[in-house]
Amino acid sequence: TEIQAQTIIISTGATAKYLGLPSEQRLRGGGVSACAVCDGFFYKGQEVAIVGGGDTAAEEATYLAKICSKVTILVRKEQMRASKVMQHRVTNTPNIDLKYNTEIDEVLGQQVVEGLRMKNNATGTIEEIPITGLFIAIGHKPNTDIFKSQIDMDDSGYIITHGKTTKTNLPGVFASGDVQDKDYRQAVTAAGTGCMAALDAERYLAGLE
């Protein structure tokens, strides 16, 4: 189908990356989430875990530590790749437990998350812990494949917008939401840039008259 228009707003979003475990996929919506800010309040006073070693994982862990009784961070490598500031914040939060060289073998539970079976990839040791929530913080993939070679993007595939606007490198083409935002990724910020894109598009169309 071909649709002709004088202006376009791209708002195809970004998709959270998951581990790909069958048990993880089965329990999405039953305790497995990719957004601590969205779903963290469901686990007030409970024990949860986060998978990831970057700034996002560290930020979500410190956020969850304020409302959950215990937060376990599972880092696949021997150290976090988060900034030194975030690493310091994590290690100085008493109810955060860091487990390095650790990967999930299976998410335990049938209808809801009840625990984790983990494997230390350095020693081969298997361990199980009880949790009620699992947060995946290993990044997002912007849904921009269809725009490759047409729209300017950064190395991660996020659309580059210019200055404080939603303008792209193509006149009349604007981008809003998670497709151009790798930092905030919230519904309210996406809605805000959507409003900005609509205003930018309106001004562009007015300039064509």
Spell out what each predicted region is:
Residues 1-12:
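Small-residue-rich anion-binding loops in enzyme active sites
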Residues 2-3, 65-163, 170, 203-209:
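A Rossmann-like FAD-binding core segment of flavoenzymes
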Residues 52-54:
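Glycine-rich Rossmann-fold phosphate-binding loop(s) that bind the pyrophosphate
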